[in-house]
UniProtKB/Swiss-Prot annotation:
It comes from Rhizobium etli (strain CIAT 652). The gene is pyrE. This is Orotate phosphoribosyltransferase. InterPro entries: OPRT (IPR023031), Or_phspho_trans_dom (IPR004467), PRibTrfase_dom (IPR000836), PRTase-like (IPR029057). It catalyses: orotidine 5'-phosphate + diphosphate = orotate + 5-phospho-alpha-D-ribose 1-diphosphate. It is an enzyme of class 2 (transferase). Its cofactor is Mg(2+). Pfam families: Pribosyltran. Pathway: Pyrimidine metabolism; UMP biosynthesis via de novo pathway; UMP from orotate: step 1/2. Keywords: Glycosyltransferase, Magnesium, Pyrimidine biosynthesis, Transferase. Homodimer.
Length: 229
């Protein structure tokens, strides 16, 4: 199904933030911080995989993803959608269906030998590939998949994350010549928390302290205090 409606960007961000709260995908624990794949300690965590269990929400989020891409990237910019193992795979399938495109998935580790050892599915040489992940912090994990696609002969100029932490900017993507698209960020989630009084004042202050200085907060709480972006 090709997306033909284009909701306001701010409306989409707010609605996705509300959906994440509604399905209890937002978690907070400053006493025992979450360890992100980057090695950072974080008092907050988003479980975007829960979106898959709620069909109406899942469908709406994928509609938003499709409209975001067609508005900001174009209608004929991609030949294939790639999902990263594991969380990106179902979202890649859903988005490929929305856009009427083939889908592949990228393994975390090669299986066998050769240029396509990490790629499952058919990706002709020179295919313009969009890589999708459920969420990204600084882009480290997404670029492992992007690099694998490029090594196999694909062209990757765009990536999309349904949720972007948005605490380090997009330098990694700029350096890697990839335009990152996203729908919602932690600031959107925090705005909903404030409006609906979902966090008490102490919790809000702790979350804001992390968002304002994430590496300093991480270092004080057992995580890394610098990243190689």
């Amino acid at each position: 199904m090709i997306q033909t409606t284009f909701p306001d960007r701010a409306v989409m961000a707010e609605l996705v933030a509300k959906m994440l709260w509604e399905i209890k995908a937002v978690h907070f624990n400053a006493g025992e911080p979450y360890k992100l794949s980057s090695g950072m300690a974080s008092p907050v965590y988003i479980d975007c995989r829960k979106l898959l269990s709620y069909p109406r929400i899942r469908s709406t989020v994928m509609d938003f993803a499709a409209s975001t891409l067609m508005r900001d990237a174009g209608f004929e910019q991609f030949d294939c959608i790639a999902g990263g193992e594991t969380a990106g795979i179902p979202f890649a399938a859903l988005l490929a269906d929305r856009l009427g495109l083939p889908m592949i998935y990228v393994r975390k580790q090669p299986k066998g030998h050769g240029r396509n050892a990490q790629i499952e599915g058919n990706m002709p040489e020179g295919s313009r590939v969009l890589v999708i992940e459920d969420l990204t912090t600084a882009g480290g994990s997404m670029f492992k998949f992007i690099d694998a696609v490029r090594a196999a002969g694909g062209i990757v100029d765009h990536g999309i994350a349904l949720f972007f932490y948005d605490i380090f900017g997009q330098q990694r993507f700029t350096d890697g010549k990839v335009r990152l698209h996203h729908i919602a960020t932690w600031r959107n989630v925090l705005a909903v928390a404030k409006a609906q009084q979902l966090f008490d004042d102490k919790t809000l202050a702790e979350v804001e302290a992390f968002l304002d200085a994430p590496l300093a907060w991480s270092g004080r709480n057992g995580g890394v205090c610098e990243l190689s972006l």
